[in-house]
């Protein structure tokens, strides 16, 4: 770190922290990132993006805006880190019955869904995929290689002397009226983007971050030969060299990052209902998604400290939300543009205030 006053401290180097760092750098702001010694859940994420919640045939809020943004945002990061990290890939939703075929066609005909769902049922047969009722085509989908993104971005920050692997010690943060100070270094603002580690943050630990453990497998199969993202009971994401990511599980009680045999068995069982060829498991990953009770993000300013901010609650759609929320938070801080009430942490602080009246 330097002796000069920085614009931002950023605590956390997962998708949220890296996205906010990128937004700040795009605006010529000075930053320092505290990465910590625990791997973020983003490393174990599939990094898939799509606009439709298939279980209920609903659109993600601000879906098109988020898709448009990520298609510009991640290529900008690619230029910075000199790596390919974002890949467009159509999604084939396996249909399990005639009723599911009809539901998909009806949904695709609704005006809001026409940009994201195709009305034609795809009967292309992948030899090793069990699909007697065909597939529904989802458009504007793909994935970001989150592991490569986070590793490469961390290397970039390291080369520029603006990241530390140390775990942030909250007790050493000194809060002044117009800046914060940490171990002698000063910054105008501090952004906490710690994912599930927020549960240990004394400034925000009372917010309702629950955390949902997710596990996925990486398999190798020479005979699967699939070049789209398959979605059924599990998703199957081709990542090259006969390798595929398979996921993902949800566990609301286990808050460890350790892979479990039960999740592995569950994923393998689901996979065998989707494909008929041999495969081998080459990797098993686990992480805690930063999920919130109301399924909405946690973004905004601390109610008592005007230079302390939160960027969290990205949940299962971190690849889409990280750029979108980072720009929203940056504009809130720098230009005083209000945050939407659905993402602002004020929705919780206001409810606490109201209940105490």
From Swiss-Prot:
Subcellular locations according to the entry: Cytoplasm; Secreted, Cell wall
Activity under varying temperature: Optimum temperature is 37 degrees Celsius.
Coiled-coil region list: none
Superkingdom to which the source organism belongs: Bacteria
Binding, D-proline: 289
Residues binding FAD, per UniProt: 13-14, 42, 47, 289, 315, 318
GO cellular component term of the entry, any: peptidoglycan-based cell wall
Keywords (A to Z) from UniProt: Cell wall, Cytoplasm, FAD, Flavoprotein, Oxidoreductase, Secreted
Residues where D-serine binds: 289
Example of a GO biological process term: amino acid catabolic process
EC number, UniProt record: 1.4.3.3
Listed cofactors: FAD
Noted pH dependence of activity: Optimum pH is 8.
Annotated signal sequence range: none
Family: Belongs to the DAMOX/DASOX family.
Cited function: Catalyzes the oxidative deamination of D-amino acids with broad substrate specificity.
The name this protein goes by in its record: D-amino-acid oxidase
